[in-house]
Each structure stands twice: as C-alpha cells, then as structure tokens.
Amino acid sequence: MRILVYGAGVQGCELAHRLLQNKKNVVTMLARGEWKERIDQKGLTIRHWAQLKTTVDRVPTIETLAPEESYDIVFVTVQAGQLPEILPVLKQNKSEFFVFVGNQPHARSVLQAMQRPADKIAFGFQNLSLIHISEPTRL
C-alpha cells in the first residue's frame, strides 16, 4: 500500500514508524526544511521511553505534494491551525482517501473544503504516550 504521511511532527513521525512495521506498506513523509534534511540524512529517530529503546527508520520524504501524485491513502497530521494553508493542496491531489489525524475541531470545514464524498475522508486520533521524537538540534 502506498501511504503518505503529510506532516512530520510528533504524530506524523510516530504514525510513519508504526506503518513501516508492515513491510507491505510503502510509506513516504511530507516534511520541510531542517527536519526533512535530518530525516533524509539520519533517518527517522524515535526514543521509546517505555520500551527503553531507540528506533531509526529510513523513510523517503517529499517537500511538496503535487496534484498528479497518487497514494492509496494520505494521513494528514498537521496542526489544526495549518489546515487552511494545506487544504487547497490536498483538494487538488488525485489521491482518493484522506485521514485527518488529531485536527478534528474543523471537521465540517475540512469536508466542505475537500469537496469529496464523505466516505473518502475520515478523522482519527492517535495515542502518543511515552515517546520522544529526536529534534534535529539535539542530535
């Protein structure tokens, strides 16, 4: 399954890590700037405090989502305040299914802005207890 995780914050990084556990998934992350460089150079590094381990995943990144790019599913993990900026980009993209994770306060406006059938858009929540995503400046 071709999967895009749109956003490389704490939720996006943890979600990408979990999705990569299934080797059938082909996961790509949309990240920008210094954080994209960090993931490209050193991998996606997560310190799992409860399990007392650190994982490093190699995951391809993109900086922008082109309208013609197609994924089986796109997980949108940006903060709710960032949605107005990215909804036009998502609306133009030809991927069929979108899951908005952790930014549900604007669900109705997201559905209206995306102009897609309601069964092609979902809203979810992710439990992120006891993990730490290593920031670029700390490693």
Annotate the PLM regions.
Residues 54-134:
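Rossmann-like NAD(P)(H) cofactor-binding subdomain of soluble oxidoreductases
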Residues 135-139:
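Short "domain-exit" segments at the C-terminal end of structured domains
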Residues 1-51:
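NAD(P)+-binding Rossmann beta1-loop-alpha1 motif at the extreme N-terminus of oxidoreductases
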